[in-house]
UniProtKB/Swiss-Prot annotation:
Coiled coil: none annotated. Residues 8-260 form the Pyruvate carboxyltransferase domain. Its EC number is 4.1.3.39. The lineage of its organism: Bacteria, Pseudomonadati, Pseudomonadota, Gammaproteobacteria, Pseudomonadales. InterPro entries: 2-IPM_HCS-like (IPR050073), 4OH_2_O-val_aldolase (IPR017629), Aldolase_TIM (IPR013785), DmpG_comm (IPR012425), DRE_TIM_HOA (IPR035685), PYR_CT (IPR000891). Catalyzes the retro-aldol cleavage of 4-hydroxy-2-oxopentanoate to pyruvate and acetaldehyde. Is involved in the meta-cleavage pathway for the degradation of 2-aminophenol. It is an enzyme of class 4 (lyase). This is 4-hydroxy-2-oxovalerate aldolase. It comes from Pseudomonas sp.
Amino acid sequence: MIDQAKKIYISDVTLRDGMHAIRHRYTLNHVSQIARALDEAGVDSIEVAHGDGLKGSSFNYGFGAYSDLEWISAAAEAVKQAKIATLLLPGIGTVHDLREAYDAGARVVRVATHCTEADVSRQHIEYARGLGMDTVGFLMMSHMQTPVGLAQQAKLMENYGAQCIYVVDSGGAMNMWDIAERFKALKDVLDPATQTGMHAHHNLSLGVANSLVALENGCDRVDASLTGMGAGAGNAPLEVFIAAAERMGLNHGCDVKKLINAAEDIVRPLQERPVRVDRETLALGYAGVYSSFLRHAETAAKKYNLSAFDILVELGKRRMIGGQEDMIVDVALDMAKGRVLPT
């Protein structure tokens, strides 16, 4: 049973994870308009960055239309209540980049690592705490760790100073029982003062359900995005999640109608590729593949006259993770040369 009196921290990711859906091409006007709408609707924080975090703009991940600092500044100037958050992946972004993001207006940082590599986050978490930022540990591809193993990684992040630890279903590959087991494991080892969060992807159409199950198991913060704008089939759609929470009598603090209008009037028209469950995005959840591989796999499939579905399934078989985007072309070349049989 979910505590109806407990305030759910609503973390919007339309302006960070949503970058993947449009190849990191938001204009500054888009950012201002979306941030203002989210702020007026009552969300607690708005994450802003290249889809792959601070300094993600690159040949490997895709170049952004603007710099992270320009996007963050535009969002910070547009809001009155919501905190501006950002994402940092050690090895891509540095503490110097984090300082610049802080100066531009970011007050929350999520330090993201693969679910087996929490130890690389220490420097960044400690630095963020030194700045006085709300500091979050973000364990990506959480389906690739056992619940106990994930909890051990979460404990490392807590020891470094993280105030909240996220279960991150980057592949949209987990079901409700997977989520429940991981939150129970985290709660068994973390200090009661350390919060937990849920970042869902909708590749198996379970983004909202998994977020609700997370809340049922003590989760404090929930990520979501307008129309689900995000990598793959997107994240838990914010307006849908809030509508469901409203019907359950949960304390979310948001205006449902304003979110629905922002989703339909502002965000959906920006989608060059519909953010939905289809053959390719379902492959991500089915094969347990990093959701941001989608657009890269589709590009490779077109170039080499292959099926994006088959490329994604093969990537899942090889257990590729975020940061190995260059391997998508290698897999496509192997398939084109007949070294790998189609699924």
